[in-house]
């Protein structure tokens, strides 16, 4: 790695963009942002940027600022690189870039606000206890003045162990020989970041004299450390139902039971990103436990097919083609081997010769909006909102607002403004052709989209106003489109009470109003101010010659759906308390949106703690990865063949953005209502 260079930042444009025509309401405006963006200071993003993985090269923090300001025309964003990979030098450069990005705006005419932040990245290892899986969480800081010396990570997990391995440098150099400069730069980065010890390994004197990485192995340790440092910070779970890192039977409720939740910091939930949708709860099981504690494979249902069962079917079909006697034995043996390795990321490789399309739709919930890959239902937003746990002398539950963001790993904040350039605007990746023997094509690459946004109701584009609204949950998520959404409780004395609020009622039936207006349709290319602010090479490299460029015409809202959840301690029967949808309203949108009012006449009778939120869904438009597996159906509507959206190998078509029609949508934050004096 001595021939390579450590990461450097780029140049932030000193130009501002013209003021946005913000969406005015009587008191507040709606601002759109992205609170989950990775630069190539993140170890995984740097790795995926390499030529061996068809990467497009380095994207440092300055790129995130320039992209947010000119390409996606956001109002706010945050760089959230993985703390576990950041050195102090990289953290300092990120903060400097964040401050420089803000400095372009004058206080009187702010065009973009950048928040400091990082990702705390935790997961249990193979065979680990699912109750000790807490997942990935972004830490977003209010201030740019009171900052930690280094970000707080969760310790090495997953990809870190592969990259830290002693054989990695040799394997990389040999696999893609001769190496390019960026390959050597990555090895220098790897050697530097993984040579820095954890602060827990040093004494106080050593910590003062040398660099170390701060670690908090649990959310509780993270919350406590944020308190010790007096940091005004929000901690936002994300990608929770994504099976890439979450064990099959992991559950958000375990964090309530184990004192791993802080209701003052963990007030938001990233329900949608470029890594999929984590909204819905479905009673599905990837495996079951027998009475003697062993793993077993459940039978498929009309709604869900476990991959262990599909593994058995593939093995049986291979056996029958070879004419090898009793194929049921082969099926049962393969099913059992799969569930025995249910936490092993190599489990899909147990059947020699099986291709991604052979697995059909296994592991995926059906008839839902872009669910995360190998879905974990008890880690979903609905499961979290429905769960209540008695822990010690307290009753714990989640009261979480819903946001979206991109989780883009190429510094492209707010990348979903147009549906194009699947790999650049999303995170789909795969090895180049001569290396697919080492990293074979896999079906998970089909499940990446261009990502979502967080929308904030705030008085003006001001750091404190935005952060206050984030704290108050007066926010909502979108799938990337700038849909306008209002959702209020109408109280006879208090008037309108906005999304994210908590209230107790005893004599008043809860009545609500909801209004949604579709996003602007887009023109091709970039606005004139982009061409006067960025040189053409930067517009091509960063924006790919396409920017947020709205017309005056809006997409139409197709319908509005209401979800009602009664909070419960019966965690084994969450499907009984989640009504999705509870109500649905068809819109007659003529370009101005639609609005409805409704009342829950059962609330005063049932006297439950109840959660309400709404989804506003646009008429169908084409989207990247809109139909990840592209099923071919038979006459009965059964999926008999898939055409995965490959990212590598002989079936990868770089011109195919895998476009399919979807109903782009917005999810409101919930309104939390309890019957007065209920617990």
Question: What are the functions of these language-model segments?
Answer:
Residues 1-52, 78-91, 95, 196-213, ...:
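C-terminal functional module detector
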Residues 25-32, 38-41, 47-77, 82-126, ...:
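Active-site-adjacent structural elements in enzyme catalytic domains
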Residues 59-66, 217, 379-382:
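Short, contiguous clusters of charged residues that form electrostatic/catalytic patches at enzyme active sites
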Residues 62, 66-67, 73, 152, ...:
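Short, intrinsically disordered, low-complexity segments enriched in Ser/Thr and Pro
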Residues 93-242, 267-270, 274:
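Extended substrate/RNA-proximal surfaces in nucleic-acid metabolism proteins
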């Amino acid at each position: 790695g001595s021939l390579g260079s450590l990461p450097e930042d780029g140049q932030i444009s000193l130009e501002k963009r013209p003021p946005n025509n913000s969406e005015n309401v009587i008191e507040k405006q709606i601002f759109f942002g992205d609170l989950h963006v990775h630069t190539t200071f993140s170890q995984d993003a740097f790795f995926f940027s390499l030529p061996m993985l068809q990467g497009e090269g380095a994207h440092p923090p300055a790129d995130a600022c320039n992209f947010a300001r000119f390409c996606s025309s956001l109002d706010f964003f945050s760089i959230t690189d993985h703390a576990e990979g950041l050195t102090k030098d990289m953290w300092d450069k990120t903060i400097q870039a964040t401050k420089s990005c803000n400095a372009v705006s004058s206080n009187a005419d702010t065009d973009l606000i950048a928040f400091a932040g990082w990702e705390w990245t935790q997961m249990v290892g193979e065979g680990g206890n699912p109750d000790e899986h807490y997942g990935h969480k972004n830490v977003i800081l209010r201030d740019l003045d009171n900052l930690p010396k280094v970000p707080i990570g969760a310790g090495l997990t997953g990809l870190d162990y592969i990259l830290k391995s002693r054989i990695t440098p040799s394997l990389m150099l040999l696999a893609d020989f001769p190496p390019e400069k960026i390959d050597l730069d990555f090895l220098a980065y790897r050697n530097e970041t993984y040579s820095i010890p954890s602060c827990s390994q040093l004494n106080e004197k050593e910590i003062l004299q040398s660099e170390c990485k701060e670690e908090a192995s649990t959310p509780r340790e993270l919350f406590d450390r944020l308190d010790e440092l007096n940091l005004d910070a929000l901690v936002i779970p994300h990608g929770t139902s994504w099976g890439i890192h979450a064990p099959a039977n992991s559950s958000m409720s375990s964090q309530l039971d184990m004192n791993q939740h802080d209701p003052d910091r963990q007030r938001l939930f990233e329900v949608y990103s470029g890594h999929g949708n984590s909204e819905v709860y479905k009673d599905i099981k990837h495996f079951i436990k027998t009475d003697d504690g062993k793993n077993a494979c459940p039978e498929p249902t009309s709604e869900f097919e476990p991959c262990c069962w599909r593994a058995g079917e593939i093995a049986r079909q291979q056996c029958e083609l070879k004419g090898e006697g009793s194929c049921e034995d082969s099926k049962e043996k393969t099913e059992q081997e799969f569930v025995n390795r249910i936490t092993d990321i190599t489990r899909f490789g147990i059947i020699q010769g099986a291709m991604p399309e052979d697995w059909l739709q296994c592991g995926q919930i059906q008839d839902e909006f872009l669910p995360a890959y190998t879905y974990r239902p008890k880690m979903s937003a609905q499961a979290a909102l429905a769960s209540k746990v008695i822990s010690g002398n307290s009753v714990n539950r989640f009261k979480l607002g819903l946001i979206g963001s991109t989780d883009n790993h190429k510094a492209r904040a707010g990348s979903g403004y147009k549906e194009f350039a699947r790999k650049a605007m999303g995170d789909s990746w795969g090895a180049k052709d001569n290396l697919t023997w080492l990293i074979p094509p896999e079906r998970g690459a089909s499940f990446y989209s261009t990502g979502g946004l967080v929308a904030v109701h705030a008085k003006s584009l001001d750091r404190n106003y935005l952060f206050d609204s984030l704290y108050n949950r007066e926010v909502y998520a979108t799938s990337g489109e700038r849909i306008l959404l209002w959702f209020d409780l109408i109280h006879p004395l208090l008037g309108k009470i906005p999304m994210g609020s908590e209230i107790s009622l005893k004599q008043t039936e809860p009545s609500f109003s909801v209004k949604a207006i579709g996003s602007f349709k887009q023109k091709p290319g970039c606005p004139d101010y982009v061409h006067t602010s960025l040189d053409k090479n930067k517009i091509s490299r960063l924006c790919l010659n396409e920017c947020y460029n709205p017309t005056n015409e809006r997409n139409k809202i197709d319908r509005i759906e209401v979800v009602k959840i009664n909070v419960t301690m019966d965690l084994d029967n969450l499907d009984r308390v989640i009504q999705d949808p509870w109500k649905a309203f068809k819109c007659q949108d003529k370009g101005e949106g639609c609005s409805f009012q409704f009342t829950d006449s059962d609330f005063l009778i049932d006297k439950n703690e109840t959660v309400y939120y709404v989804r506003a869904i646009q008429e169908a438009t084409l989207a990247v990865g809109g139909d990840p597996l592209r099923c071919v159906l038979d006459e009965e509507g059964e999926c008999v063949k898939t055409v995965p959206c490959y990212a590598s190998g002989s079936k990868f078509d770089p011109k195919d953005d895998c476009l399919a029609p979807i109903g782009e949508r917005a999810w409101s934050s919930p309104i939390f209502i309890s019957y007065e004096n209920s617990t």
